[in-house]
């Protein structure tokens, strides 16, 4: 079994495209806001939180041209066929996370605890996001650094 290699990406100036406008897309965008990345949301509708964020919004169904210049792509729609098509349209050099199917992703997010002087990342290698979140919450409750 191949395991992932954890890294912390410097995203300043990088183009990130999130396809979808729901809760998962909102959570991904919130996590990216302070990275200096150029964030674009593509969705016919979006949550009120996404609508308030200082990001680019394209009110549209997904089209392949939406991901052409993206460094990172997040598939966050509630349509499996759309998510599958996005992963097929992605170029080999693009990093893509299909939030609905880990087998179509070439990276996964980690749960993080960030403080001014450290960043702690927790992962189940994309196998169990709920467990990852529970571990993070347990560490946050029991640790004072």
What are the residue ranges of the model-derived segments?
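Short, ordered loop/turn segments at secondary-structure junctions
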Residues: 44-46, 62, 101-104, 125
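ADP-ribose/adenylate-binding Rossmann-like module
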Residues: 72-76, 83-108
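Adenosine-phosphate binding glycine-rich loop
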Residues: 10, 113-145
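Short beta-strand and adjoining strand-loop segment in the mid-core
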Residues: 40, 70-79, 118-127
């Amino acid at each position: 079994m191949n395991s992932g290699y954890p890294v912390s990406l410097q995203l300043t100036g990088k183009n990130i495209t999130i396809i979808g406008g729901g809760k998962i897309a909102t959570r991904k965008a919130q996590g990216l806001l302070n990275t200096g990345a150029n964030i674009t949301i593509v969705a016919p509708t979006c949550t009120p939180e996404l609508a308030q964020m200082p990001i680019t919004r394209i009110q549209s169904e997904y089209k392949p041209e939406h991901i052409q210049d993206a460094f990172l792509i997040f598939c966050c729609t509630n349509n499996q066929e759309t998510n599958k098509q996005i992963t097929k349209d992605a170029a080999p050099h693009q990093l893509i996370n299909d939030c609905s199917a880990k087998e179509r992703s070439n990276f996964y997010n980690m749960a993080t605890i960030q403080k001014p002087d450290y960043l702690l990342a927790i992962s189940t290698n994309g196998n169990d996001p709920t467990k990852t979140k529970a571990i993070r919450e347990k560490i946050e409750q029991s640790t004072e650094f």
